[in-house]
Structure formats: structure tokens, C-alpha cells
């Protein structure tokens, strides 16, 4: 059946994207090509990713696939490969945001902040703060480019979120306070 073939093709492409992304990350860390290839296969074939696809979390899967190469861009920039690091970071931030799973990208920002903090400490100890600030500037520009490429998508997602159940809370403050102050009031014991 044609429909089943399309599903298998999509899973193969998604798995390849996952492998390639992790391969790029391992290469940025200086791992040899064959070990990076093996690492990419092991990463892509971990069970969690294959649970996401049949569960219908395709865009979460794709967003997660673009996180390792985004980290690779950050690593490259702080290893004084400013242009390559900036391009890789901008490209994969743009692809991450295009995947439209903003929640995963938001959580990923905290990982990046941790990396930046670690690189700052390292640069401070080595007295290489000018290099740190140059790399950070390149990465900030890359982030702006990645976001600006998707500004229309982000705006429409923001507008749409106001109309969904994930928009504003339906809880009323007075109701919440009643439940907090008298949690057993409605229980029949």
C-alpha cells in the first residue's frame, strides 16, 4: 500500500536526520568520523525516539534531532571557528523553530545557557575573555538570524495559542484559594 510506504520513508528520513545531527555534534567535539558515525547510529536508534514517531510526536522528534547540531555550532564557535559555528548554529536554530515544537526549544535554551556559563568560566580562567565575547556575539547573531527566519511562524503560533486550551488559564483565583485553604472540604469521609 502506498500509504504504508510513505510512513516507512518518513521514518527512514527522520532517523537519518537524527543520526546526522548527532554525527555533526561528535565531529565538533573532535571525535573521529567512524566513531561519530557509530555514535550517530546509537543515538538515533535509542528507544525513546522510536516511541515518539508512532505516538505522533513527529515535530518533537524533529526538534530533538536538530538539538545536537545546534550544540555543535556552539562548540565550534567557542573553539574559535566563529564563521562555521555561527552558520551551523543559525541553520539549526532556524530548523528547530521551523519544526514548531517551541517547548522543546525553550527547554534547550537552558542547556545552551549552561554551556555558555561553562565556556565563560573556562575563558575567565585562561584569560581569554575577548575570545569568549567574540564567540558569544557570533552566537547571539546566529540566534537572531534563526529566530528572524521564523518570525512569521512564531507570531502565528503566539496568536493561535491565545485561542487554545493551552492559552490563558481558566482557573479563578478565588476558587484556587478555596481549594488551598480547605483541601478536604469536598471529600466525604
Please provide the spans of the model-predicted regions.
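A generic secondary-structure micro-motif detector
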Residues: 11-12, 132
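Alpha-helical transmembrane segments of multi-pass integral membrane proteins
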Residues: 10-11, 59
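Short, small-residue-biased leader/transition segments that mark boundaries at the very start
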Residues: 3-8, 179-186
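Membrane-embedded helix bundles of polyisoprenyl
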Residues: 16-29, 33-122, 135-157
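Cytosolic catalytic cores of cyclic-nucleotide second-messenger enzymes
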Residues: 189
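Membrane-interfacial, low-structure loops and terminal tails that flank and connect transmembrane helices
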Residues: 125-134
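Extracytoplasmic catalytic-loop and juxtamembrane helix elements of membrane-embedded
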Residues: 157-177
Amino acid at each position: 500500500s502506498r500509504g504504508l510506504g510513505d510512513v516507512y520513508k518518513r521514518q527512514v528520513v527522520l532517523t537519518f536526520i537524527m543520526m546526522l545531527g548527532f554525527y555533526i555534534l561528535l565531529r565538533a567535539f573532535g571525535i573521529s568520523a567512524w566513531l561519530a558515525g557509530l555514535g550517530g547510529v546509537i543515538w538515533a536508534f535509542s528507544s525513546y525516539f522510536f516511541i515518539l514517531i508512532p505516538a505522533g510526536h513527529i515535530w518533537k522528534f524533529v526538534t530533538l534531532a536538530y538539538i545536537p547540531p545546534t550544540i555543535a555550532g556552539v562548540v565550534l564557535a567557542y573553539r574559535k571557528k566563529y564563521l562555521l559555528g555561527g552558520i551551523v548554529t543559525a541553520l539549526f536554530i532556524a530548523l528547530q523553530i521551523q519544526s514548531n515544537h517551541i517547548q522543546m526549544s525553550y527547554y534547550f535554551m537552558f542547556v545552551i545557557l549552561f554551556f555558555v556559563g561553562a565556556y565563560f568560566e573556562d575563558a575567565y580562567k585562561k584569560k581569554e575573555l575577548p575570545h569568549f565575547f567574540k564567540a558569544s556575539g557570533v552566537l547571539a547573531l546566529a540566534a537572531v538570524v534563526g529566530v528572524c527566519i521564523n518570525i512569521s511562524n512564531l507570531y502565528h503560533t503566539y496568536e493561535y495559542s491565545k485561542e487554545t486550551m493551552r492559552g490563558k488559564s481558566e482557573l479563578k483565583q478565588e476558587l484556587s484559594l478555596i481549594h488551598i485553604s480547605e483541601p478536604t472540604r469536598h471529600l466525604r469521609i
